[in-house]
C-alpha cells in the first residue's frame, strides 16, 4: 500500500489535548488591572456614583471629563478593591472579534462593568510591556481561545514520540503542565529532526484559553515553554 506525504504527516503529527471548555472567566487582583495599564476609579458617571477605569496615572481625584457623550467625575483613584468585592474578567465574542470584559462583583453577585476593550489589542500591549517576545512571535489569532503557532525549517516525516530528542519531550511536558493549570489546551506537534546547523525542525499549533494569558504568572510559563524550542535569529 502506497502512503502519500499527506497521510504520513497526519499519522505522525502528535496531538495532546486537555479537553473541556476554554476558560471564559478568571478572577484577578487589582494589580493585574494596573499591569494592563488601567486605574480603578470610584466616581460619578452622569451624576451617579459608580466604578470605572481610566488609563494608568491619567486622572487624579477631583478631575472631571467627558467621554463618549457621558460626564465623568473622579472621586478616588483606588489602591485596593472596594470592600466585599472581587474583580473578574472574561472574554466575549462579537462578530468574530474578542473583547475582554472586566467586572466588579459584590457579595450579592451583582456585577459592575468597569472595562471593555478588544482582547487582542490589550493582550499584545501587555505582552510587549512584559517583554514576552516568544508569545508575541507565536500568537496568530485571539478568540475565547487563542492560537500560538510556529514552524522552523522544512517539513518531512515527523518523528514518533519514542524517537523524539530530549528538547522536544521537554517542550511537550512543559506545555502539558501549562494546560493542566489552565484547564484547557490542544497541542499539535510535528518534529522532523534537526537542520544542518543542529537546530530543531518542527511545526506546532497550540490552543490555550485567552483569558489565562492575562495572568502574568501563566504568561511567563507559556513564554518559557516556547523558549525551549527557540532557535538562533
From Swiss-Prot:
Transmembrane segments: none
Pfam families named in the record: UPF0128
Signal peptide: none
Recorded superkingdom: Archaea
Family according to the record: Belongs to the UPF0128 family.
Name this polypeptide is given: UPF0128 protein MJ1463
Organism: Methanocaldococcus jannaschii (strain ATCC 43067 / DSM 2661 / JAL-1 / JCM 10045 / NBRC 100440) (Methanococcus jannaschii)
